[in-house]
C-alpha cells in the first residue's frame, strides 16, 4: 500500500481530473452521434479509462525522471519522490516503460487507428519534459499532451478523426497552457537562474498573466464553437457558462500582487472547471 501511495504521488494522480473529464465528454459525444448503437460499450469505456491512466503515468513518470536533478535543486520540488529518495530514478524509469507497454497493448485491443497512433501519443506526452529546456512554448506542449485525450477517446469509439473532438482538443490545449503559465510563476526566479524556458522566465509577471488571459480568451472562443456544433441543449450552455465564469475567477484571484492564490487557481478552480463542464455537457448530450 505504501508503494502505491508513493507512485500515486509520483504521477500526481489527483491531477487526472484535468484531462479525464474531457475524454469522457468526447466519448459520450462519439456514442450518441454514432449512426448505429456502439457494441461492447462498457468494454470501450474501460479501454479509454485505462489508456488515460497509462498515458498519464507515462507522462508524469517520465517528467519526474527527466527532471529529478533539477527538482532536487528547487526548494519547491525537492520533496518530490525521486529527489527525496522515496523512489529511485531506475524504478521510476521502469514504471514509465511498463505503463508505455500497457498503453500500447490496450490501444491494440481497441482498433487499428488507435494502435497506429499510440507511439505518436506517447511521444507527445513525453515531449513536454524536455521542451522547457529549449522553448517558452512548453506550456502549449503540455496543453497538447492533455488535448489529445478527447481526440483519442473519440477515435476509440468511431475509428476516425472528426472536427468536434479536435476543437475540444484546442480548448484543452489553450486552457491547460494558460493555467500552466500561472503555475510557472512560482518557479520564475529559479527557471531564470537555471536557464530554463517558460513564459514567466522570459517575460514580466504582468505580461505573463496577459498572455495567460489571451490563451483563455482563445479557450472560451473555441468552447463556444464546440458547444454551437453540439446538439442545442440548455445543460450544455450552462456548463459552458460556468466553465467560463470559473476561468474569469482564476484571473481575479491571481494578479501580479496576489500570487499567493496560485495553488487555489491551479488545482482547485481548474479541477472544478473541468468537472463542471463535463458533467453538464454529458447530461446535455444524453438528454438532447
Question: Which residues fall in each region the model found?
Answer:
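Intramembrane alpha-helical segments
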Residues: 4-9, 50, 57, 77-168, ...
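Cytosolic, membrane-interface loops and tails of multi-pass inner-membrane proteins
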Residues: 1-5, 60-87, 181-205, 253-262
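Multi-pass membrane catalytic core of lipid/isoprenoid biosynthesis enzymes
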Residues: 44-52, 68-118, 193-234, 273
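Extended hydrophobic alpha-helices typical of membrane-associated regions
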Residues: 2-5, 218, 225-288
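N-terminal, positively charged, Ser/Thr/Ala/Gly-biased leader segments
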Residues: 1-21, 25
